[in-house]
Amino acid sequence: MRSPIARRATAFSMALCACLAACLSGCRGEANAGDPELVMELAISPTPPGVGPARLIITLRDTSGAPMDGARILVEGNMSHAGMVPVLDTASADEGGRYYVPEFDFTMAGDWVLILEASLPDGRTARIQHPLRVARTPGGPKG
């Protein structure tokens, strides 16, 4: 039988590992949700984006790398402070699992979170959250 101190040490170690895993998984910059067999990636031009229009290029594929065409992808942009109206748009389909928003309008410099939600005709979904900082001018210094 283990002592109470050993049980507490084990519980503490497990809690510490869980916290560490949660922190490290957040370092990637994107949080994926939905069907684990779908992978959605985002590229933005210019980088960093500035106040005004930016092109969003979205790639949707399965885990084997096969492109996923026919999806409907909604994009929502939110600033990190309260009171800002979200910027909403829908991506247009290209080919080879590529979708784009030609002019996503970043209305203000600062910290943003883009939320992309994809729905395929077969009912599968994918969702990512992509934090980013919008510069005062396109391609200029952040902030």
Identify what each model region corresponds to.
Residues 27-143:
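N-terminal soluble domains immediately following signal/targeting peptides that reside
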Residues 1-25:
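Sec-dependent bacterial lipoprotein signal peptides
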